[in-house]
Amino acid sequence: MADAYAHREQREYVFTGTRGRVFVREWPGDRARSIVLLVHGYGEHTGRYEELAAVLAAHGAAVLGPDHIGHGRSGGERVVIEDFEDVVTDLHTVADRARAGHPGLPLVLVGHSMGGLIAARYAQRYGDGLAALVLSGPVIGAWETPARLLSHEEIPDIPISPAALSRDPAVGAAYAADPLVWHGPMKRPTLEAFVRALAAVDEGGDVGRLPVLWLHGDDDRLVPLPGSRVGVERLSGVDLTERVWPGARHELFHETVRAEVFAELTRFLDRVSGC
């Protein structure tokens, strides 16, 4: 599928965010009917979502997403996030620019893993400006990794296993070879920020009538499904769509079943954007 979208146009821009330079990628849509704002996960960057972005752009979405501070081509010490509220504020800056370029179009947030945490908090702060929220393997609810790592005097260097991402070996190989991906240990300020952000989302209330699509693999060992369910059920309001793929691992947008995942997502976009 990736080859079919290999030449999709991409644009870039930068702005000064709350804590430094933020790099943003854009994929213009074909006669855009909606705006999709991608929110990437820990240690990675939006460049890993080119296939997803191209599929969505071909389906009529104007797609864009920032590299969070400390990630990818944005500034800051690598993988250091002092406060996730700042990342949410930066994301809102990107959303405002997208709305200005596409006035009147519905805006949908798609957050993966740590990006799901950021997207959830965004929906709590700025949900009135959203048409829908999509969460893929979201770090919300009962996620024990930060507390476990913080219990050590020195944070252990336990790299993410590429095999935990997808059953497609090419995905793991590309991840391991990507110079913009962080392959070192998690950092204490970021882990502490995770703890605060998880609590903020937990205490921030539900999103009311905002449509929510939750996507998860039942063999996700990085962000186990049961813990996420706690957070999703607390966050979602009256309109939750849940889709779980048997045997799938953490990165559904890079999984062997990604064509099914893309189809589920585009159907949801059609519904929430009134197409």
Predicted segments with their positions:
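Short alpha-helix in the alpha/beta-hydrolase fold that links the catalytic acid
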Residues: 224-233
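Short beta-strand/loop motif that positions the catalytic acidic residue
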Residues: 208, 214-216, 220
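N-terminal cap/lid segment of alpha/beta-hydrolase-fold proteins
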Residues: 1-28
